[in-house]
Amino acid sequence: MELYNETPLHRDNFLSLVREGAYDGVLFHRVIQDFMIQGGDPDSVSASPGQMLGEGDRDYKVPPEFRLEEGIYHRRGSLAAAREGDDVNPGKESSAMQFYIVWGRVFDDEGLDRVQKRLDMSTGGTVVLSGEQRHSYKTEGGTPHLDGQYTVFGKVTGGLDVVDSIQRVPTDANDRPLEDVRIIKAYVVK
């Protein structure tokens, strides 16, 4: 993983949690094929098989850091912060611990035009997919409908094949993998 300096609040928060061992033993508790893999729920460390997860977190939120103009968006392999929905979190503040890694899909122009209309409605026209974004979503894939909605703060730099394997595992009705997929140990590499 590489963390972006352009998102210092999220970067520093994530590094602090890694250094204290907060991610050691947590599950990827929500996996949706052709969309993303989500982890970081501290309750997942000791979760029973089939237990509903996704509510665990620390007692603080991280302010949003959207950096679309700097080329930081939801392309395949992006690391982003999960958050509660707009109905209870209109400020789009990020979860302190929960994160997801984007898989998504490849789009054509027609599909991206539909995404742009959806973004126009949800953001009041403040998020416009750039030419670079459109090209990336047409070649690499990703989740463009999340741009300007969730903070992207890093990317997978090696092991995208592992992300692909995880996003393909069988899941239950709550998108939890039928067999646990666990982060054994997270550590900082300089």
What residues fall within each predicted segment?
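Cyclophilin-like peptidyl-prolyl cis-trans isomerases
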Residues: 1-190
